[in-house]
Swiss-Prot record:
Gene this protein is translated from: atpF
Physiological role: F(1)F(0) ATP synthase produces ATP from ADP in the presence of a proton or sodium gradient. F-type ATPases consist of two structural domains, F(1) containing the extramembraneous catalytic core and F(0) containing the membrane proton channel, linked together by a central stalk and a peripheral stalk. During catalysis, ATP synthesis in the catalytic domain of F(1) is coupled via a rotary mechanism of the central stalk subunits to proton translocation. Component of the F(0) channel, it forms part of the peripheral stalk, linking F(1) to F(0).
GO CC annotation terms, alphabetical: plasma membrane; proton-transporting ATP synthase complex
Subunit composition and interactions: F-type ATPases have 2 components, F(1) - the catalytic core - and F(0) - the membrane proton channel. F(1) has five subunits: alpha(3), beta(3), gamma(1), delta(1), epsilon(1). F(0) has three main subunits: a(1), b(2) and c(10-14). The alpha and beta chains form an alternating ring which encloses part of the gamma chain. F(1) is attached to F(0) by a central stalk formed by the gamma and epsilon chains, while a peripheral stalk is formed by the delta and b chains.
Membrane topology note: Single-pass membrane protein
Protein name in UniProt: ATP synthase subunit b
Localization terms from the record: Cell membrane
Transmembrane segments: 7-27
Similarity comment: family membership: Belongs to the ATPase B chain family.
Source organism of the structure: Streptococcus agalactiae serotype V (strain ATCC BAA-611 / 2603 V/R)
Main location: membrane
Length: 165
């Protein structure tokens, strides 16, 4: 029985080996191009997918870089706008201060002119009163012959009237 098993086993091995060899020959003859075509198509699809993914990654990186540049430019522009606003505000403040100083100087000069005019008018009024009092004093002195004491009293009262005026 062991010889029978051995010869059956060898026969089975030969038949199976022949069948496998025949199968490979048939596959090579009839289906090899389709099978390799499927593998090549699959390889090409994977390569295309990798290329597409690489392009998408590069586009995403370019987009991210562009957005970062735009953000940086926006920040720079915002800082410039803020700086310009500060400068404009300071210039406007300086202008307002300058205008206020000019107006204050103008008002001060006008006040000085008004004071000088009022002083001149007051002096003119005082001169008029002094002239009137002088004439009145001279008339009194001429009308009456006064002695020295009476003249002195008259002059003192004249000076007192000038002080009151």
């Amino acid at each position: 029985m062991s010889i029978l098993i051995n010869s059956t086993t060898i026969g089975d091995i030969i038949i199976v080996s022949g069948s496998v060899l025949l199968l490979f020959i048939l596959i090579k003859t009839f289906a090899w191009k389709q099978i390799t075509g499927i593998f090549e198509a699959r390889e090409q699809k994977i390569a295309n997918d990798i290329d597409t993914a690489e392009q998408a990654r590069q586009q995403a990186e370019a987009f991210a870089t562009k957005r970062e540049e735009e953000l940086s430019n926006a920040k720079t522009e915002a800082n410039q706008i803020i700086d310009n606003a500060k400068e404009t505000g300071l210039a406007k403040g300086d202008q307002i201060i300058s205008e206020a100083k000019t107006e204050a100087d103008r008002l001060k000069e006008k006040a000085h002119q008004d004071i000088a005019q009022n002083k001149a008018e007051a002096l003119a009024d005082v001169k008029g009163e002094v002239a009137d009092l002088t004439v009145l004093l001279a008339e009194k002195i001429m009308v009456s012959n006064l002695d020295k004491e009476a003249q002195s009293n008259l002059i003192d009262s004249y000076i007192k009237k000038l002080g009151d005026a």
